[in-house]
Amino acid sequence: MYKLLILIDGISNSGGTDRVASTLSSLLSNHNYDVTLYSLNSGEPYYPVDNKVSIRQPKSSMRLFKLFEFIRYAKNTRPDGVMIISMGKLSVQALLLSKLFRVKSRLICCDHVSIETFSAAVRKLKVFCYGLAEKVVVLTQHDKNYLTSAFSLKNVYVVGNISPFHHENSLNRFDDVFARKQNRVLAVGRLTYQKNFGRLLDIWKNVHKQGWKLLIVGDGEEKAELLEKIKKYHLEESAEIVSPSKKISEYYRSSGVIAMTSRYEGLPMVLIEAKNYALPAIAFDCKTGPAEIIKDDGYVVDYQSNELFTAQLNQLIASEQLRKNFAQAAWQNSADYGPELILKKWNDILN
């Protein structure tokens, strides 16, 4: 049996990367992989993890010492492969230390954010570290094309994220799912600079709402600022922010549109998950992800144009038939992120 050690920053957070790590480790553990999920930060898993997966956490409190503990664990247990799932910083640290301390396992780097979001100096450092890995797995074809053309990397592969809600399609009929939709625009994510929800509120104040409401699900350092903006724009009756919930599926199930105004992404789980609930999508064309996820099931909007985003959101609100057409396409396209296809790609990479 293939022994796989997966390193992540934390398993107790509600972010998309944490969701991916939990879902992927559970999937692999049920398909002839002996999986250990090593979380640098302590805490109980926020998302479900299969009981076949062994969960390890360091005892140290300082990050550097936590990384040293991980390296020692990797050297002692000698897994066939070490997979680093990272938002950027962790992959650099873990790859450098793994080579410095001569970890013998195959090193597989999985970065969940576009390298183009970093400065030129950081890009060079990351590309150097990518060269230390046997394989580099990115989330989009755009990222692979950039790394192979700009830096001539040969060890780059593309594997998308698995939707944790893929079972919804087999359990329900599309017409029943669509019938449960309410007049709500849903946005999900951390209330941070990256997710750019302030811009969504700037847009929402100009939308012809026709009884629709905006629901933002998330927590973070910008919450007070966003609440103040809701008050400033007099949106108290049409916009609301609620804390993250493990029952996020209920929000997906009952909403009519999913919206995203992020400054940058990797391959946003929110847009992938929304497909399983037949949600039409509207998102800015940020790097990277929306343009590869949204096909014939929504709008990808020029990043510079709030006006176009507003106009196309108005179209979605005004036309139930348009929403139904997009919803049907999203329902069908969700198969692209099902476990069978993603598992095959990982089998090819790991074996």
From Swiss-Prot:
Annotated GO biological process: carbohydrate derivative metabolic process; polysaccharide biosynthetic process
Listed InterPro entries: Glyco_trans_1
UniProt key word RNA-binding: no
Keywords recorded for this protein, A-Z: Exopolysaccharide synthesis, Glycosyltransferase, Transferase, Virulence
EC number(s) per entry: 2.4.-.-
Pfam families cross-referenced by the UniProt entry: Glycos_transf_1 (PF00534)
Pathway terms, separated by semicolons: Glycan metabolism; exopolysaccharide biosynthesis
Molecular function (Gene Ontology), one example: glycosyltransferase activity
Family from the record: Belongs to the glycosyltransferase group 1 family. Glycosyltransferase 4 subfamily.
PANTHER family cross-referenced by the UniProt entry: GLYCOSYLTRANSFERASE
UniProt function note: Involved in the biosynthesis of amylovoran which functions as a virulence factor. May be involved in the formation of galactose alpha-1,6 linkages in amylovoran.
UniProt protein name: Amylovoran biosynthesis glycosyltransferase AmsD
Native source species: Erwinia amylovora (Fire blight bacteria)
Origin organism lineage: Bacteria, Pseudomonadati, Pseudomonadota, Gammaproteobacteria, Enterobacterales
Designated gene of the protein: amsD
